């Protein structure tokens, strides 16, 4: 499954995680991506969308 939003382009983010003793380990944070049927250019199409774009109404779902 895609790890990138087709609407806003949000993807995974790399960084460093710190424990209580301040030891470091590299890790990635994944966006909350959903596969939905949406209307794109007047036709229903399956796209990958983050939940923030879904909630903000940037996507019109296909019925």
From Swiss-Prot:
Keyword vocabulary terms for this entry: Ribonucleoprotein, Ribosomal protein
Pfam families: Ribosomal_L28
Transmembrane segments: none
GO molecular function: structural constituent of ribosome
SUPFAM superfamilies the UniProt entry points to: L28p-like (SSF143800)
GO cellular component: ribonucleoprotein complex; ribosome
One of the protein's GO biological processes: translation
Family to which this protein belongs: Belongs to the bacterial ribosomal protein bL28 family.
Name of the featured protein: Large ribosomal subunit protein bL28
Organism: Clostridium acetobutylicum (strain ATCC 824 / DSM 792 / JCM 1419 / IAM 19013 / LMG 5710 / NBRC 13948 / NRRL B-527 / VKM B-1787 / 2291 / W)
Organism taxonomic ancestry: Bacteria, Bacillati, Bacillota, Clostridia, Eubacteriales
Gene: rpmB
């Amino acid at each position: 499954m895609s790890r990138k939003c087709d609407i806003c382009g949000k993807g995974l983010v790399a960084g460093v995680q710190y424990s209580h003793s301040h030891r470091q380990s590299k890790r990635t944070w994944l966006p909350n991506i959903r596969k939905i049927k949406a209307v794109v250019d007047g036709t229903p199409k399956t796209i990958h969308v983050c939940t923030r774009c879904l909630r903000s109404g940037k996507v019109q779902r296909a019925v």
